[in-house]
């Protein structure tokens, strides 16, 4: 219910529409994305993780991806604690690899849980093997696009936090109270 109230049909964020699905149990983000194949209708899609809270909207990134002929796009944000996130290793203007929660991060750029994919993402997911956690990992999907040099990226403007820990949930509440969220 709250997702529907907050996000509506997606038009306010520059999207054509938003569809919702429900994942029973834990299977990984890529498994959850696989559930969306039936309503993606061969079109490009945007995936936003439910614990992301951002200051600015993603309209600019949506427009950049809309003009991209094929492949994927992720949003990055420089963070003080990159070991908590998937981290992008940058080589010039491209991403060389994404490493999930590295002990020694190769950059301070966390992968924000906002992803854009072309219709090939579902074929990529079908080739994945479950990780050691028994899940289909979105990092593996992103690394496949990187290997094919079909991944682009933008820096997310404004602040970003996840609400995945009690500490980050408190921080999210403070940030939203101070500046609001999803501002134009």
Predicted regions and their residues:
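Glycine-rich beta-alpha junction loops
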Residues: 52-54, 78-81, 102, 158-159
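Conserved catalytic core of nucleotide-sugar-dependent glycosyltransferases
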Residues: 84-86, 90-96
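Short, conserved catalytic or adaptor-binding loops enriched in Gly and charged residues
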Residues: 9-15, 89-90, 144-146
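Catalytic-core segments of class I nucleotidyltransferases/pyrophosphorylases
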Residues: 62, 66, 94-184
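Structural beta-sheet core signal
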Residues: 47-48, 72-75, 153
């Amino acid at each position: 219910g709250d997702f529907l109230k907050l996000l509506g049909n997606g038009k306010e964020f520059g999207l054509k529409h938003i569809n919702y699905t429900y994942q029973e149990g834990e299977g990984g983000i890529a498994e959850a994305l696989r559930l969306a194949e039936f309503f993606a209708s061969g079109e490009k899609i945007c995936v936003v993780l439910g614990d992301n809270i951002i200051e600015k909207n993603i309209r600019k990134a949506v427009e950049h991806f809309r003009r991209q002929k094929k492949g994927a796009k992720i949003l990055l944000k420089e963070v003080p604690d990159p070991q908590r996130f998937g981290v992008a290793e940058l080589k010039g203007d491209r991403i060389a690899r994404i490493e999930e929660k590295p002990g020694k991060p190769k950059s301070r750029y966390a992968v924000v849980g906002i992803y854009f994919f072309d219709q090939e993402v579902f074929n990529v997911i079908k080739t994945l093997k479950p990780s050691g956690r028994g899940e289909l990992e979105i990092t593996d999907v992103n690394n496949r696009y990187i290997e094919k040099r079909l991944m682009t990226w933008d820096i997310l403007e404004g602040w970003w936090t996840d609400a995945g820990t009690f500490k980050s949930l408190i921080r999210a509440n403070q940030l939203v109270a101070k500046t609001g969220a999803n501002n134009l």
